[in-house]
Every structure is written in structure tokens, then in C-alpha cells.
């Protein structure tokens, strides 16, 4: 028996998966309801959610953090689910962890650059 257990990187990915799942279950539906349904129906008074106000929010520090969380966390959750679904279906992608988590990392960097240049 090995007395020195090997360190695992899985808690990092499970943490991002859990955070993305919670974000996707609690925050994302509310934002989609506000922006995709209620805003076009005119449920908000006047310029409450005008383009200029939304752009100003998105260009503020808290708005940029919100956009990053809104995109990156569900992205990690989804790619983690796909990685484990492929494993459950006995479809073994060579270096699957590198493929799926690498793609999530690359897309996170692209999102970060995109949000910073907003």
C-alpha cells in the first residue's frame, strides 16, 4: 500500500463545476428572464434598462466581474459535465482531461480578454 497518496487536481475542477452549476441554477435564469423576456415586453419603466445604462454597468468593475462570472462559471460546469458524460458513455477521448479542461481554460482566457476590452 502506498503510504504517500498522490495529490489530485479534481477538487479544483469540481469546485468550478459546483460554482458554475449553482450560478447556472440561481443567477442565470433571473438574468435571462430580465433581459430576454421582461425587457422586450417593456416591463421596466422608462430608461431603467436602457442600452447606455447597461453599457455603463458592463464597463464598471463590478459589471465586468459579473460578466466574467456569468460566462466562465457555466462554461466550466458544462465542459466538466461533457467530460464526465463521455466517460460514462464509455467514449474515451485521448487525454480527455486536457481536452475539456484545456478548452475551458482557453475559452476563459478569451472571455477575460473580451470583457477587459469592452
Curated annotation (Swiss-Prot):
The entry's keywords: Cell inner membrane, Cell membrane, Membrane, Transmembrane, Transmembrane helix
InterPro entries, per database record: Fumarate_red_D (IPR003418), SQR/QFR_C/D (IPR034804)
TM region(s), chain numbering: 24-44, 54-74, 98-118
GO MF assignments: succinate dehydrogenase activity
Residues annotated as signal peptide: none
Gene3D superfamilies per record: Fumarate reductase/succinate dehydrogenase, transmembrane subunit
Source organism superkingdom: Bacteria
Subcellular location: Cell inner membrane
Pfam families associated with the record: Fumarate_red_D (PF02313)
Membrane topology: Multi-pass membrane protein
Record's GO cellular component terms: fumarate reductase complex; plasma membrane
SUPFAM superfamilies assigned: Fumarate reductase respiratory complex transmembrane subunits
Any one biological process term the GO annotation gives: fumarate metabolic process
UniProt similarity note: Belongs to the FrdD family.
Subunit structure of this chain's protein: Part of an enzyme complex containing four subunits: a flavoprotein (FrdA), an iron-sulfur protein (FrdB), and two hydrophobic anchor proteins (FrdC and FrdD).
Function: Two distinct, membrane-bound, FAD-containing enzymes are responsible for the catalysis of fumarate and succinate interconversion; fumarate reductase is used in anaerobic growth, and succinate dehydrogenase is used in aerobic growth. Anchors the catalytic components of the fumarate reductase complex to the cell inner membrane, binds quinones.
Matches recorded under NCBIfam families: PRK05470.1-1
UniProt-recorded name of the protein: Fumarate reductase subunit D
Organism expressing this protein natively: Yersinia pestis
Lineage, top ranks: Bacteria, Pseudomonadati, Pseudomonadota, Gammaproteobacteria, Enterobacterales
Amino acid at each position: 500500500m502506498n503510504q504517500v497518496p498522490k495529490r489530485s487536481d479534481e477538487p479544483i475542477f469540481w469546485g468550478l463545476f459546483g460554482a458554475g452549476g449553482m450560478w447556472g441554477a440561481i443567477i442565470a435564469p433571473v438574468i435571462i428572464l430580465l433581459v430576454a423576456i421582461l425587457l422586450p415586453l417593456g416591463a421596466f419603466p422608462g430608461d431603467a434598462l436602457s442600452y447606455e445604462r447597461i453599457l455603463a454597468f458592463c464597463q464598471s468593475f463590478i459589471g465586468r466581474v459579473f460578466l466574467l462570472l456569468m460566462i466562465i462559471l457555466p462554461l466550466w460546469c458544462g465542459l466538466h459535465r461533457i467530460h464526465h458524460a463521455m466517460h460514462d458513455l464509455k467514449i474515451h477521448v485521448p487525454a480527455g482531461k486536457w481536452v475539456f479542461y484545456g478548452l475551458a481554460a482557453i475559452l476563459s482566457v478569451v472571455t477575460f480578454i473580451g470583457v477587459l476590452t469592452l
